[in-house]
């Protein structure tokens, strides 16, 4: 679930 959160913080 880091991929989804990563794109959100990006």
Curated annotation (Swiss-Prot):
Top-level division of the source organism's lineage: Bacteria
Record-annotated disulphide pairs: none
Cellular component, GO, one term: periplasmic space
Keyword vocabulary terms for this entry: Periplasm, Sugar transport, Transport
Subcellular localization(s) per the UniProt record: Periplasm
Similarity comment: Belongs to the bacterial solute-binding protein 1 family.
Role summary: Involved in the high-affinity maltose membrane transport system. Initial receptor for the active transport of and chemotaxis toward maltooligosaccharides.
Protein name, as recorded: Maltose-binding periplasmic protein
Annotated organism of origin: Klebsiella pneumoniae
């Amino acid at each position: 679930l880091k991929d989804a959160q990563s794109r959100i913080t990006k």
